[in-house]
Amino acid sequence: MEEFQRYFELNRYQQHNFLYPLIFQEYIAALAHDHGLNRSILLENTGYGNKFSLLSVKRLITQMYQQNHLIISANDSSQNQFFGHNKNLYSQMISEGFAVIVEIPFSLRLRSSLEGKEIVKSQNLQSIHSIFPFLEDKFLHLNYVLDILIPYPIHLEILVQTLRHWVKDASSLHLLRFFLHEYRNWNSLITPKKTSSSFSKRNQRLFFFLYNSHVCEYESIFIFILSQSSHLRSTSSGALLERIYFYGKIEHSVEVFAKDFPSILCLLKDPFIHYLRYQGKSILASKGTPLLMNKWKYYLVNSWQCHFYVWSQSRRIYINQLSNHFLDFLGYLSSVRLNPSMVRSQMLENSFLIDNAIKKFETIVPIIPLIGSLAKAKFCNVLGHPISKPVWADLSDSDIIDRFGRICRNLSHYHSGSSKKKSLYRIKYILRLSCARTLARKHKSTVRAFLKMKRVGSELLEKFFTEEEQVFSLTFPRVSSTSTSRGLYRRRIWYLDIICINDLANHE
């Protein structure tokens, strides 16, 4: 119990008293304006150690500004909203600048938590594909899964309370309240099916940071219970646990929680349990019984409502059996299927037939939502029939082919982990024919006549069929034989360099 209480001690020495003056510096506005900022820069600045003072934050921001050479050219003024007359311009710049500032201490803590760990390349943990090998390895031995829709706070002030115990600058907190009340429908960021305003689209960085910080508050205690009740230990989860910090609102819940911890641990004892979170959903998979999963379900609901001021209902958590359920997340439909097989056993004069079912983890590309995304982007109709892209007809032939080829390669790269490539081949066919029809529309010809053109037709085929195989051969240079290469190409391949979901792949 002493170890448990020490685990929940607050880190009050890491308090930044005056962040407000930094927001209005010129280099902050430049950093906030650069939407292509490489966040790995925050982890590559090694000269500051564990110093979380205002001066170190300011030096880091200055260094980031100098490294990226974010000089706004006057030539871009006609095309860039930075110089436009938008009523939300200044609130956008300031909110993005605020997000840049508050992200730096968290990035420094992440780097310090990874030091000394057996993680060679921590950036691989940031890849979206890194979760699928974990599922493939672990879910074969599990039976049930909880599909959880993460609740959102009942009041915007709760998001401010998340930061107020390490940011003592009242001006910054008042400014944060201004952003939150200007955008009242902030929870539509977490539930993408709802409509969102233009302000939300320009300030997603700040809102996602606040939302993740708030989720980590109550998620931390939950993960701690999992680590104590399970026999499993993971280096990656250990590193993630150390980057979580607990604030004032948890003090009361910790006091109550510490008294009931032995009974809770006994109630929810499960030697094999796994947890993962993505966007506004999370998954809790277990080898236990439906009764145990119901206990977890009602414990989560009561914990959210009683201790963290988060409104939730039991109907937002679904209990499903892995063998009869598809996990719909991150652009894939994942499931655990039983492959039946029959073995004949011969003993002396008698023979027996033995049924042997083998579990197999499958990941499938959901073709219908993906075709819907292509139809929304005007590459095909709702039935999946390719159509031309009129808005690109004014571009050069090479630019049109490059754009279609880039989309096709990105989708193939992201969905390379699919167990069945048939759906992916159909998507490539739609894009290829849409490209041909766009070029034929530009040249006022038919698709058949256009494809007979030797130069353009061969270039089109080369873009869509040979370039992907060239990238594959560069990824696996030791694969020499053609048959071996084709067999490996048909298998699931997970890449550890994918840190964002393609817009066409994100159909949730």
UniProtKB/Swiss-Prot annotation:
Gene Ontology terms describing biological process = mRNA processing; RNA splicing; tRNA processing
**Entry keyword Translocase:** no
Domain of life assignment? Eukaryota
Keywords, comma-separated and alphabetical: Chloroplast, mRNA processing, Plastid, RNA-binding, tRNA processing
Q: Which GO terms describe its cellular component?
A: chloroplast
Q: Summarize the protein's role.
A: Usually encoded in the trnK tRNA gene intron. Probably assists in splicing its own and other chloroplast group II introns.
Q: Which family does it belong to?
A: Belongs to the intron maturase 2 family. MatK subfamily.
State what protein this is by name: Maturase K
Source organism phylogeny: Eukaryota, Viridiplantae, Streptophyta, Embryophyta, Tracheophyta
